[in-house]
Amino acid sequence: MSKIVFCDFDGTITAVETFAGMLKEFAPDLSAQIMPQMYARTLSLRRGVRQLLESIPSQKYADIIAYAENKPIRPGLAEFLAFLQEQSIPFIIISGGIQGMIETVLKREGLLDKVTAIYGVNLHTQGEYLQVHSDWENETELVAKALIMDKYSGVETIAIGDSVTDITMARKADLVFARDRLIDYLQAENQPYIPWDNFFEIREYLLLRD
């Protein structure tokens, strides 16, 4: 059966929480108030992330993109993407973070053209404050990951993630690689997963399994 890989970005491809870190940098007080509620799942990602982003002045957009420029990625991503290309397995990034930040990091690494598609949040900067736009918004998420996965039917789905934004993606996938907070959420729901630390490990697992 053909496969497809869906991967989070913030804290998954990046070795640090790039989007969450940016929010703490540019909206520190509101982040301290809202982020614990999102992690506890008492406030929806849709409401919380929108509220945080739309509290930031539009003139800060260039600084936001620059914030991502030096953020490190997890080891093995280039090798993992090369492996997927050899196997003709699409690699799709689905992120609740900002599209421009994702593209900035991938361009720096020379990997943007190795990614099949990127789904993230776009920001409009015409007004005084940032305005959020997402084509994949639902009742609880700004970027509804399971909804995007539905576009790609008839294949084995592999999910890679690390946190609260990846729960619906993990529930939907046939095979899940989880780390950090996502492990706790999946354990609480008795959902199966494979722990991972770097992309070399994921490549090795898929090689041995096949």
Curated annotation (Swiss-Prot):
GO cellular component: cytoplasm
Enzyme class per UniProt: hydrolase
Single GO molecular function: L-phosphoserine phosphatase activity
Record protein name field: 2-hydroxy-3-keto-5-methylthiopentenyl-1-phosphate phosphatase
Function: Dephosphorylates 2-hydroxy-3-keto-5-methylthiopentenyl-1-phosphate (HK-MTPenyl-1-P) yielding 1,2-dihydroxy-3-keto-5-methylthiopentene (DHK-MTPene).
Pfam families: HAD
Keyword Amino-acid biosynthesis: yes
UniProt-listed Enzyme Commission number(s): 3.1.3.87
Organism: Microcystis aeruginosa
Keywords: Amino-acid biosynthesis, Hydrolase, Methionine biosynthesis
Domain of life per record: Bacteria
PANTHER family xrefs: PHOSPHOSERINE PHOSPHATASE, POLYOL PHOSPHATE PHOSPHATASE PYP1
UniProt GO BP: L-methionine salvage from methylthioadenosine; L-serine biosynthetic process
Pathway given in the UniProt record: Amino-acid biosynthesis; L-methionine biosynthesis via salvage pathway; L-methionine from S-methyl-5-thio-alpha-D-ribose 1-phosphate: step 4/6
SUPFAM superfamilies attached to this UniProt entry: HAD-like
Family, per entry: Belongs to the HAD-like hydrolase superfamily. MtnX family.
Catalytic reactions of this protein: 2-hydroxy-5-methylsulfanyl-3-oxopent-1-enyl phosphate + H2O = 1,2-dihydroxy-5-(methylsulfanyl)pent-1-en-3-one + phosphate
